[in-house]
Amino acid sequence: MIYLVEDDKSIRELLVYTLNNSGLPANGFEKPSEFYRELRADDADLIILDIMLPECDGLTMLKNLRVDEKTKHIPVMMLTAKGSEYDKVVGLDMGADDY
């Protein structure tokens, strides 16, 4: 299962639809709290995080995922409109598998 955390409804629905229609089961979450609730109940095979989110930014979520024994092995991709080299380096340095 792929978990996508994206607060923009249009982007979230488009990506979840595309992944599901490609044979990749996916579930989208608007808020980090919704994501964490589901993650406690069921493991993810891949996590895709937006950086700019309500409640908590994606980089903080990434940091929390990397220090947790249950989730540190799950691949994480960062998804954002912020595309500067600096932002990419920060995301990858914090443990993202792709940006």
Tell where the protein language model's regions lie, with residue ranges.
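N-terminal/domain-start alpha-helical segments
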Residues: M1-Y99
